[in-house]
UniProtKB/Swiss-Prot annotation:
Residues 35-402 are lumenal. GO terms for biological process: cell wall organization; root hair cell development. InterPro entries: Nucl-diP-sugar_transferase, Nucleotide-diphossugar_trans, RRA1/2/3. One of its GO terms (cellular component) is Golgi membrane. It is an enzyme of class 2 (transferase). PANTHER family: ARABINOSYLTRANSFERASE RRA1-RELATED, ARABINOSYLTRANSFERASE RRA3. Disruption phenotype: Reduced arabinose content in the insoluble cell wall fraction of meristematic region. Reduced root hair length and content of arabinosylated extensins in root cell walls. GO terms for molecular function: glycosyltransferase activity. A motif (DXD motif) lies at residues 225-227. Residues 1-13 are cytoplasmic. This is Arabinosyltransferase RRA1. Keywords: Cell wall biogenesis/degradation, Glycoprotein, Glycosyltransferase, Golgi apparatus, Membrane, Signal-anchor, Transferase, Transmembrane, Transmembrane helix.
Length: 402
């Protein structure tokens, strides 16, 4: 037994030595290959997130750069293809003429009438419209007194193509009893609820949704608010050379048609002045739309913005008309014209300027829009007294403002 123990002991000691050597060898290998994980295993776990984050950021930046580059290439391809399509659709090759003879194209082609959009409205417009044009007025019972004054002025002038879109049953009955052409819409809860509102701003926003079908059917539409008196037939005073032809909120040639406005920043020293172009807004209560794609797109854009973000319809109307394309936004490519501010007259022009000028008082405007004043009905009646019945002092009792 003693001899056997003596023989086994050297082997056991040798095995232990070999195991130690193998362990040291593996430790050295691990130290060389993965020093952080081996030497500082615990701290590496704690710091793994911070070490990993910059690498992931770099990875995301690299991916973003690749995607941005591909996106730029795709955008260029779309632009090139769009230009090829435009050239293919162009019926004739256009060459620039001599200096002073070149004018851009601003009159877009009209859309092909699509009677399937609303067969019932199509049949009605065939009877009421004149030369494929129609005046459209949206109204509810809350504004009936003003509508009565307007309808009387329309009949007095002899306008035949005038159509009311009643927003409640009471006004529909009024149109029937007064033999006024009207269009009863199909039930639509989204429109019906707002249509019965007493808030004129809410009701006003509906017109952009309602007018779309008129344009789809191929009709030129002259939209009119109810606070307007007609003194002449407006269709004889339209140019029809633009997608949108609108009256202005401006009160003279500068504010209505545009002027330079100087912005002054003294901190910029010698470069302190910057010239800006300004124009007072188009009035969304009286405008003419040709049945073109840009006109329909305008209605769609305004309707979409109002439904998602709300806001005043006139502000949204002008934003889409005038804001240019810029990064993140593609502007509306619609041609536009401002109506003569003294023919299509707003109430500021009438009460602050015209009534105080003996020569200007002799001119007869096409319409008068009481958009600047809250006592609309009384001023509409006074305008009729002055321009129709010849009562020279009919306008004198009113203040310049409301």
């Amino acid at each position: 037994m003693a001899v056997r123990k003596e023989k086994v002991q050297p082997f056991r000691e040798c095995g232990i030595a070999i195991a130690v050597l193998v362990g040291i060898f593996i430790g050295c290998v691990c130290t060389i290959l993965i020093p952080n994980d081996f030497v500082n295993f615990r701290s590496s776990k704690v710091a793994s997130a911070s070490c990993e984050s910059p690498e992931r950021v770099k990875m995301f930046k690299a991916e973003f750069a690749i995607i941005s580059e591909k996106n730029g290439e795709l955008r260029k391809q779309v632009s090139d293809l769009t230009e090829k399509v435009r050239l293919a659709e162009q019926k004739e090759v256009i060459k620039a003429g001599p200096f002073g003879t070149v004018t851009g194209l601003q009159t877009n082609p009209t859309v092909a009438p699509d009677e399937s959009a609303n067969p019932r409205l199509a049949k009605l417009l065939e009877k009421v419209a004149v030369n494929k044009e129609i005046i459209v007025v949206l109204a509810n019972n809350n504004v009936k007194p003003m509508l009565e004054v307007q309808i009387a002025s329309v009949k007095r002038v002899g306008i035949q193509n005038y159509l009311v879109v009643p927003l409640d049953d009471s006004l529909e009955s009024f149109c029937k009893s007064n033999e006024v052409a009207y269009y009863k819409r199909d039930p639509d809860n989204a429109i019906d609820v707002v249509g019965k509102s007493r808030r004129s701003s809410d009701v006003s926003g509906l017109k952009f949704r309602v007018l779309r079908e008129f344009l789809q059917l191929g009709y030129g539409v002259l939209l009119s608010d109810v606070d307007i008196v007609f003194l002449q037939n407006p269709f004889g005073h339209l140019y029809r050379d633009s997608d949108v032809e609108s009256m202005s909120d401006g009160h003279d040639n500068n504010t209505a048609y545009g002027f330079n406005d100087v912005f002054d920043d003294p901190t910029m020293t010698r470069s302190r002045t910057v010239y800006t172009n300004r124009i007072w807004v188009f009035n969304s209560g009286f405008f003419y739309l040709r049945p073109t794609l840009p006109s329909i797109e305008l209605l769609d854009r305004v309707t979409d913005t109002l439904s998602k973000s709300g806001g005043w319809d006139q502000a949204v109307f002008n934003q889409h008309l005038f804001y240019p394309s810029h990064p993140g936004y593609t502007g509306l490519y619609a041609s536009k014209r401002v109506m003569d501010v003294y023919e299509f007259m707003n109430s500021r022009v009438l009460f602050k300027t015209v009534r105080k000028d003996e020569e200007m008082k002799k001119l007869k405007p096409v319409i008068i829009h009481m958009n600047y004043h809250s006592d609309k009905l009384e001023r509409m009646q006074a305008a009729v007294e002055f321009y129709v019945n010849g009562k020279q002092d009919a306008l004198d009792r009113f203040r310049d403002g409301s």
